[in-house]
């Protein structure tokens, strides 16, 4: 009898919880319509995988790409709407969050074509790969709009877990397994450190979890200038440093870049940074509003270390992917300048603009590496020697993307860095901008060294990989070249038409 009553109570409680969740989704679902499109795409992928055979593989790419494009369209239609807080304060919709969501969707849309031929050559399971990519995208989008500590952590872990699975997707590759283990351990440690910092915020604010309510709670408890806030700031900054690959928390990055499948590295190299930047900007600017001087100093130190170490270590690399790993550490150091400047002097606008340019430059470079790797099977920088003689289009595309990463005019990277450094200079960050300029010149050296190899015509320097180089006959390589062409064009001309981009970026205020 007692068991029967307890069972009835359990059913009633479960029904109430379900009805409450259904009510929230029914009345708040329109606020996460782009995310709902991705969820529908995920369900559709699973259904087709269960009911079809391998002959329907093109449908998997079509459904994934279409759901991403429709999600971008839905996001653009919602642009300039009034800021809304939904799901009982757990999720916020505003221009600032939406532009980061747009960048994540753009990254995923460009990355899927890069994976087509790679998956066919390595015989990877296509459905699971696309499911992980879409789920990671979904986690990144929720992270951009998360408005409380719990939602932030859940969305961050959703993105991180999919990243770990993608990193170790080629299970037979020992380097991939090693990279995954390092990524998992370092990612788990960084998440623990981040959550420990969150627990300090929760306690000091009197039990608040919403970002704005944490500020009000700190004022009410008079803890906004206490030593506990400094402890929370240190732990959260360290956790964010791992997620952003800031020096000295960058140790996992080169190994993960080198060991993971190249399309996965392309995806993680941009989406993880965009999502982490969205989190860092909001978590530092809102709860730590009263500690701005302290976190500005911390970020300045990390930015300087990242710019110097990243670019110095990139010079000595022999692997193209490891070189790009260290280059990305230096690049994120430049972006941090925009966070430090903040809303004043268009700091956030410069950060968003540079990230848009960085997406095109970085993905364009990785598209070239994917094509070269599939046709030669090597990742060594020396093996690129003389590529221009065999494939001028690929060599020129890679050269343009590398020059744009280095910041040479008139490419997009130059205008992005110019605007970023100008905003930093206007804000009085003279030393930081000077370091950025010096390390940018340093980065041009190792990019030009690779370009010189690409264009060399001396037979003694050309390796057997390029001598035996053949364009792939597979029809699917057109998708990689299409994505590469889009990125190369964007890396070349986006900087010339910066005014509309800046106008949009300047609208992304809290």
Swiss-Prot record:
Assembly description: NDH is composed of at least 16 different subunits, 5 of which are encoded in the nucleus.
Lineage: Eukaryota, Viridiplantae, Streptophyta, Embryophyta, Tracheophyta
E.C. number(s) listed in UniProt: 7.1.1.-
Molecular functions per Gene Ontology: NADH dehydrogenase (ubiquinone) activity; quinone binding
Residues passing through the membrane, by range: 31-51, 59-79, 99-119, 124-144, 149-169, 184-204, 229-249, 261-281, 295-315, 323-343, 354-374, 395-415, 418-438, 484-504
Protein's UniProt keywords contain Aminoacyl-tRNA synthetase: no
Protein name: NAD(P)H-quinone oxidoreductase subunit 2 A, chloroplastic
Organism: Hordeum vulgare (Barley)
GO cellular component: chloroplast thylakoid membrane
Entry keywords, A to Z: Chloroplast, Membrane, NAD, NADP, Plastid, Plastoquinone, Quinone, Thylakoid, Translocase, Transmembrane, Transmembrane helix, Transport
Pfam families: Ndh2_N, Proton_antipo_M
Function, as annotated: NDH shuttles electrons from NAD(P)H:plastoquinone, via FMN and iron-sulfur (Fe-S) centers, to quinones in the photosynthetic chain and possibly in a chloroplast respiratory chain. The immediate electron acceptor for the enzyme in this species is believed to be plastoquinone. Couples the redox reaction to proton translocation, and thus conserves the redox energy in a proton gradient.
Domain of life of the organism encoding this protein: Eukaryota
């Amino acid at each position: 009898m007692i068991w029967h009553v307890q069972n009835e109570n359990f059913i009633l409680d479960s029904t109430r919880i379900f009805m409450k969740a259904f009510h929230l989704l029914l009345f708040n679902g329109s606020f996460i319509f782009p995310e709902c499109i991705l969820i529908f795409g995920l369900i559709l992928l699973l259904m087709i995988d269960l009911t079809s055979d391998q002959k329907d593989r093109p449908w998997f790419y079509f459904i994934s790409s279409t759901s991403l494009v429709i999600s971008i369209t839905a996001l653009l239609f919602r642009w300039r709407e009034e800021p809304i807080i939904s799901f009982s304060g757990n999720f916020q919709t505003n221009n600032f969050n939406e532009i980061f969501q747009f960048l994540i969707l753009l990254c995923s849309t460009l990355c899927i074509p890069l994976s087509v031929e790679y998956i066919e050559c390595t015989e990877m399971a296509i459905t699971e790969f696309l499911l992980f990519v879409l789920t990671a995208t979904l986690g990144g989008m929720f992270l951009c709009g998360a408005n409380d500590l719990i939602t932030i952590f859940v969305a961050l872990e959703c993105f991180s877990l999919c990243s770990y699975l993608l990193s170790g997707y080629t299970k037979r590759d020992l380097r991939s397994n090693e990279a995954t283990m390092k990524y998992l351990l370092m990612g788990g440690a960084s998440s623990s450190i981040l959550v420990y910092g969150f627990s300090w915020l929760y306690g000091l604010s009197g039990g608040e979890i919403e970002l704005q309510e944490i500020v009000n709670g700190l004022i009410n408890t008079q803890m906004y200038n206490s030593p506990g806030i400094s402890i929370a700031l240190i732990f959260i900054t360290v956790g964010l440093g791992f997620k952003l690959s800031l020096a000295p928390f960058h140790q996992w990055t080169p190994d993960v870049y080198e060991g993971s499948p190249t399309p996965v590295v392309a995806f993680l190299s941009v989406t993880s940074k965009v999502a982490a930047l969205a989190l860092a900007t909001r978590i530092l600017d809102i709860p730590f509003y009263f500690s701005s001087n302290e976190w500005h100093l911390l970020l300045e130190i990390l930015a300087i270390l990242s710019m110097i170490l990243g670019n110095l270590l990139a010079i000595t690399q022999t692997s193209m992917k490891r070189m790009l790993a260290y280059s990305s550490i230096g690049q994120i150091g430049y972006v941090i300048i925009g966070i430090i400047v903040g809303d004043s002097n268009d700091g956030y606008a410069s950060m968003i603009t540079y990230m848009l340019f960085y997406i095109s430059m970085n993905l364009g470079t990785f598209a070239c590496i994917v094509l070269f790797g599939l046709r030669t099977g090597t990742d060594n920088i020396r093996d690129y020697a003389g590529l221009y003689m065999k494939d001028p289009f690929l060599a020129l595309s890679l050269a343009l993307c590398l020059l744009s990463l280095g910041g040479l005019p008139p490419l997009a990277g130059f205008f992005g860095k110019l605007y970023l450094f100008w905003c930093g200079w206007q804000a009085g960050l003279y030393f930081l901008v000077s370091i950025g300029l010096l390390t940018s010149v340093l980065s041009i050296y190792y990019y030009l060294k690779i370009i010189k190899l690409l264009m060399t015509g001396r037979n003694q320097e050309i390796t057997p990989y390029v001598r035996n180089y053949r364009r792939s006959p597979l029809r699917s390589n057109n998708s990689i070249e299409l994505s590469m062409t889009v990125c190369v064009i964007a890396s070349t001309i986006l900087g010339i038409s910066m005014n509309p981009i800046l106008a949009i970026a300047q609208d992304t205020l809290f």
